[in-house]
Amino acid sequence: NGPEGKAGSAPGSAGHLNGRKRDLLEGGIRVPGLIEWPGKIRPGNTTMPAVTSDYLPTILDLICAKPGGDRPLDGISLRPLFNGAMKNRGQSIGFQSARQVALIGDRFKLWGRAGGKQVDKLPTLKLFDLVNDPSEKTDVAVQHPEVVARMTRELKIWRTSVQASDRGDD
């Protein structure tokens, strides 16, 4: 999940991707993933975003089990991806770490870094088109204000859910 330290002062490279370890830019969080179940999941590859919180819903779906209790599960089942029925993820992936926030959708990523101790307030957000600019070099927020508005609402809902989970409320 990205090379350690500041660029130039520590070994490692994120290649063409922007960011390093502990960044919520692609160079800090984009990693390959592998799921294998011989005889059950056909070999293949995808560029669809996924996250470790997708594992539990996927495993439960694969073994036809239901989660216990009434707590909501983070993540989605990737089972439809394995059989070719999933063309888009549909549900965005939220991240918050070290005064950064990010929301990754099927095409766009909303990202921001808060200054000082403003971790509870949303920072100024940038929008990156991960399909056409996986290196996150160009902020396209001005060109897509409706996407910024929609993803900002999604990010706020996601953060509220995370805060409820942190308190043990769900």
Over which residues does each language-model region extend?
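Active-site-proximal N-terminal segment of extracellular/periplasmic enzymes that hydrolyze or transfer
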Residues: 4, 138-146
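A general alpha-helix detector
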Residues: 58, 136-139
